[in-house]
Each structure stands twice: as structure tokens, then as C-alpha cells.
Amino acid sequence: MVRCRVRSPSERSHEVYRQQLHGQEQGHHGQEEQGLSPEHVEVYERTHGHSHYRRRHCSRRRLRRIHRQQHRSCRRRKRRSCRHRRRHRKGCRTRRRTCRRH
């Protein structure tokens, strides 16, 4: 599938910023005070909407969850296997001990 090149949000925001500067020079101070135009809102959503999403990856809560999952995942698997296969309970207990060392 071929896609045409779309400008990145950063390129677009610079272009809008330039337009605002030129508008102020010509004497259009009222438009900026009233609020964002539809075009500016679109740019604002693109540039600022994803910034929160990107920050989320580095949050301590998320890192802690990932860290916990690494340690608990093997224990969870063993517990589930025990529930389904009741015959092998003794083998599962010995496996759990080796699992906790990690």
C-alpha cells in the first residue's frame, strides 16, 4: 500500500506559529484572544493529544506492573496448571520453589 507523505505534527505547528506571527504584525490581535480557530484546534489536538500517551510509558505504576508480571507470571502458570491437572500437584510444588528463586 502506497501512502503519500503527510507532514508531522511538529512541522504543522511551526507553520501555524509562523502564520500567527504574520497575523499579529498585520494587526489581527483579536483572533488570538478569542480562542483557537478550527485549524489551530486540529494542530493542538495532534501535538498535545499524543504527548500524554507517550509519557504514560515511563510512569512508575506501569513499570511496576510490568516488573510484577515478570515475577508472578511463572507462578500464575503453575497455579493454573494445578487447577486443570490435579494429578500433578506434587510436581507443581517443587517447580514453584525453583520459580521463586528468580
Curated annotation (Swiss-Prot):
GO terms for cellular component: nucleosome; nucleus. Keywords: Chromosome, Developmental protein, Differentiation, DNA condensation, DNA-binding, Nucleosome core, Nucleus, Phosphoprotein, Spermatogenesis. Testis. GO terms for biological process: chromosome condensation; nucleus organization; spermatid development; spermatogenesis. The keyword Phosphoprotein applies. Residues 8-17, 39-48 have a biased composition (Basic and acidic residues). Residues 49-102 have a biased composition (Basic residues). It is found in: Nucleus; Chromosome. One of its GO terms (molecular function) is DNA binding. The keyword Transferase does not apply. Residues 1-102 are annotated as: Disordered. Proteolytic processing into mature chains is required for histone eviction during spermatogenesis. Transition proteins (TNP1 and TNP2) are required for processing. The modification Phosphoserine is found at residues 8, 10, 37. Interacts with TDRP. Protamines substitute for histones in the chromatin of sperm during the haploid phase of spermatogenesis. They compact sperm DNA into a highly condensed, stable and inactive complex. Belongs to the protamine P2 family. This is Protamine-2. The gene is PRM2.
